[in-house]
């Protein structure tokens, strides 16, 4: 069934810009304040007040545009988007329509492998349509008011950058990969804190399906306010199934706005989807056109950090990482800095090993305890010493994991923690040939059946003998030497 249909996805992402004050007023943007304590006369739309543009919001938009190789409009216009909602006091939202500040651009994503579907990891470039500045609306509160709705206008006027893609994603996996790449970029640039639980980064997914080979797009449904990557994936997967089943049963997909219910793992209809003309956009007469001269753009460009895409390419070229691995270790600025600090200690020859540890043991522990890399109990220098001891043959990879966990659990602060633990627990790898030969002779004598099976051509028996040798040394034998000595003795 699925092979008859092509999925078409476009994302609209609202990134809350990290300014101290709102986009058109001096009110604070701090999250979690008591309701309506951060709403000034401009936010409340009181008579006689006028909006004043926040320069910091514009600079953050320029940063983003430069980072995605977009065109920064030298002149852009703010428009009024007219609609009624209780948490929109003015009766319109100040946004950009015909001439946005950021035009075009692209983001390259790394889509992970899907073993169940038999798909390998691949790279894809997603083109962006635009990114425009706008103000956020307030918030409706339903829980604390029996039979009524409360309105909190603290969020009204908070600066947003709405980032719109072309409809070029063809699966939920691609949409999630794009959302993660975008999230990583805005956090990397420092223009958004990326806190999805607080609503700083939220996605609307436009989803449609069409028969394979058809050029015309199908009717789309927009799924609003998805504030986690898991919800984004689940919502798209459900919506794709819903639309395909509806069409195959003889029904018609309706253009509408839908909400995702994470408890039921399904989307439900919210309202009919509006078109642009329904909002009666027109230029805001209270705001002059936004003029950005070339010198301003050049100054911002000179202040940009090394971007994730450039760093990924450097890691591939300099350290021999795969594009996917380079993408993982540059998922955040702190992660990339940690990785480079490890490599600086162990040397470029161990760069791939360092990446594997960062994506494996380190990430596993961080995820298990809900920590960011910046809060890792094991420092880059401590991990580097663990990797050095593997490289110089002092410990095996298995023992290294034990030492890593010991450093993690005791929250050791000494850089030489690995050496201290190796010495205290007697974990040095046995590499003495004479000692290993004696152990292997004992293993062979005690496991004659496995010896006979190996000589009869059963390779699994050889692995069993290696396992017995490692068991006899409590995992401290040098695995490579054990392998070589066993082969020698078995002829």
Curated annotation (Swiss-Prot):
Gene3D superfamilies: 1.10.10.410, GatB domain, N-terminal subdomain. Keywords: ATP-binding, Ligase, Nucleotide-binding, Protein biosynthesis. It comes from Paraburkholderia phymatum (strain DSM 17167 / CIP 108236 / LMG 21445 / STM815). Its EC number is 6.3.5.-. One of its GO terms (molecular function) is ATP binding. Allows the formation of correctly charged Asn-tRNA(Asn) or Gln-tRNA(Gln) through the transamidation of misacylated Asp-tRNA(Asn) or Glu-tRNA(Gln) in organisms which lack either or both of asparaginyl-tRNA or glutaminyl-tRNA synthetases. The reaction takes place in the presence of glutamine and ATP through an activated phospho-Asp-tRNA(Asn) or phospho-Glu-tRNA(Gln). Transmembrane segments: none annotated. The gene is gatB. NCBIfam families: gatB, PRK05477.1-2, PRK05477.1-4, PRK05477.1-5. It is an enzyme of class 6 (ligase). Pfam families: GatB_N (PF02934), GatB_Yqey (PF02637). Belongs to the GatB/GatE family. GatB subfamily. This is Aspartyl/glutamyl-tRNA(Asn/Gln) amidotransferase subunit B. Heterotrimer of A, B and C subunits. One of its GO terms (biological process) is translation. It catalyses: L-glutamyl-tRNA(Gln) + L-glutamine + ATP + H2O = L-glutaminyl-tRNA(Gln) + L-glutamate + ADP + phosphate + H(+); L-aspartyl-tRNA(Asn) + L-glutamine + ATP + H2O = L-asparaginyl-tRNA(Asn) + L-glutamate + ADP + phosphate + 2 H(+).
């Amino acid at each position: 069934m699925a092979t008859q249909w092509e999925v078409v996805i476009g994302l609209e992402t609202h990134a809350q810009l990290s300014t101290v004050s709102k986009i058109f007023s001096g009110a604070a943007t701090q999250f979690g304040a008591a309701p309506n304590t951060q709403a000034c006369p401009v936010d409340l739309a009181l008579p006689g007040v006028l909006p004043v543009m926040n320069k910091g919001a514009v600079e953050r938009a320029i940063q983003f545009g430069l980072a995605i190789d977009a065109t920064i409009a030298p002149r852009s216009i703010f428009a009024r988007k007219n609609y009624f909602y209780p948490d929109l006091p003015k009766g319109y939202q100040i946004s950009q329509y015909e001439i946005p500040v950021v035009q075009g651009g692209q983001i390259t994503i790394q889509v992970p492998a899907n073993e169940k579907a038999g798909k390998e990891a691949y790279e894809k470039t997603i083109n962006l349509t635009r990114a425009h500045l706008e103000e956020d609306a307030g918030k409706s509160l339903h829980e604390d008011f029996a039979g009524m709705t409360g309105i909190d206008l603290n969020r009204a006027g908070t600066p947003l950058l709405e980032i719109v893609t072309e409809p070029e994603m063809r699966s939920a996996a691609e949409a999630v990969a794009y959302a993660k790449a975008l999230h990583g970029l805005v956090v990397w640039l420092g223009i958004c804190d990326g806190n999805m639980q607080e609503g700083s980064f939220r996605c609307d997914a436009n989803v449609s399906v069409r028969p394979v080979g058809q050029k015309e797009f199908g009717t789309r449904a927009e799924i609003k306010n998805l504030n986690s990557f898991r919800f984004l994936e689940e919502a798209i997967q459900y919506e794709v199934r819903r639309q395909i089943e509806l069409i195959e049963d003889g029904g018609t997909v309706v253009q509408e706005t839908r909400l995702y219910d994470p408890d039921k793992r399904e989307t439900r209809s919210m309202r009919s989807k509006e078109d642009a003309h329904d909002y009666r956009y027109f230029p805001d007469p209270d705001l002059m056109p936004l003029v950005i001269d070339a010198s301003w753009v050049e100054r911002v460009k000179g202040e940009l950090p090394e971007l994730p895409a450039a760093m990924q390419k450097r890691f591939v070229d300099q350290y021999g990482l795969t594009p996917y691995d380079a993408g993982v270790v540059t998922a955040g600025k702190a992660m990339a800095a940690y990785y480079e600090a490890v490599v600086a200690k162990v040397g470029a020859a161990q760069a791939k090993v360092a990446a594997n540890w960062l994506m494996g043991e380190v990430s596993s522990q961080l995820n298990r305890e809900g920590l960011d890399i910046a809060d890792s109990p094991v420092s880059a220098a401590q991990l580097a010493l663990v990797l050095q001891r593997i490289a110089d043959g002092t410990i095996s990879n298995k023992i290294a994991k034990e030492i890593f966990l010991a450093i993690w659990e005791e929250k050791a602060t000494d850089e030489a923690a690995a050496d201290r633990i190796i010495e205290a627990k007697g974990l040095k790898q046995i590499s003495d040939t004479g000692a290993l030969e004696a152990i292997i002779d004992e293993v062979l004598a005690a496991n004659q059946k496995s010896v006979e099976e190996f000589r009869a051509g059963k390779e699994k028996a050889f692995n069993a003998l290696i396992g017995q040798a490692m068991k006899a040394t409590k995992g401290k034998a040098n695995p490579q030497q054990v392998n070589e000595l066993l082969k020698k003795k078995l002829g």
